[in-house]
Amino acid sequence: MFSLLALAPGKKIPSTFAAVKAVIEYILKIDFGDHSRLVPFVDSLYEHVSILEDWKAMADLLQTDSSNKAFREVKAFLPRDSDEEAVLAHLLVCCLKKGSGIVEVAELDTKISLLQGKKKAKDLNSEFQAEFSPHFARVLPELFSQFKSDPAVLSALVEIPCLMNLDTFSTLKSNKGFGSIPKIVGEMVATENELDLLQSCCKTLRALQSHQSTGTQVNAEISQLMDNLVQQLEERTDAVKNFDGDEADFNTSLVDLSASLLRLNSVVNQVDLTSDEVSFEKKGELFDLVLDLAGSHDELLREEHLDEVEGDEKLEREKVVDEVWLHHFPQQ
């Protein structure tokens, strides 16, 4: 394994991809744990380890499709497992943020995004953003598809649209790949259960929603997403309330209901649903469903049936029912 000292400016390294591989191995050896701890790592080394500025090399290592032009060159240095892929994806995003002029300050469990200098958008490195934006407009849909079953990687990749120079959208929108990104992110929200990934997706939708060049398209996607999520919640609420099967299988229906509420809660808390361009048909039905669930704690628990399940399953049911409430009524 290479030492990070070998990656300092002026030192000879076998190849750019070997250098990226060395950084990944170093990070895994140190065992940072939470990927958020990569923020100070990148912040402190970005000016001294030049490979951290090579976003293209990191992106090429993520694309394992053999049809990728760079595949032959990168094959020997590709991530060996999901842990290396996750580190690479989060490292890439941290480096894009640093290069763009965005600083993340990790304080306890809270992340605050700050802009360098005068903390104004104009202080961002727009030249750097304009450099990587067209590339990711093209490859992000492919990467989303490639890592569709890996939430750890997706939670990093889905942040990239927020970092792109959306002022160039008039040029980028002709790229079918970029135009599909809001739809893909919306589909993730409708199917994923991982909280970190859901929050990252909703933050991206909110960022795209607030930009004049992408807002109209994203608001249409959000409207469709909300209709889909409310319908999903209706179906899963009915499945729970009208459950008539093996009591041991009831927890599965509860978990599905909890997942639907988690998705809705993520959207409601982070996306602007008050926009005039957001109009979903099932808005009234959502209100009725929430009121219905608010008074359904005991009904969801099915106390009269709890003696039919084992101790662990009973505890799991109580836990999930509490989660169902918390997802919509966090103040309680």
Residue ranges, per PLM feature:
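Extended alpha-solenoid helical-repeat scaffolds
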Residues: 1-332
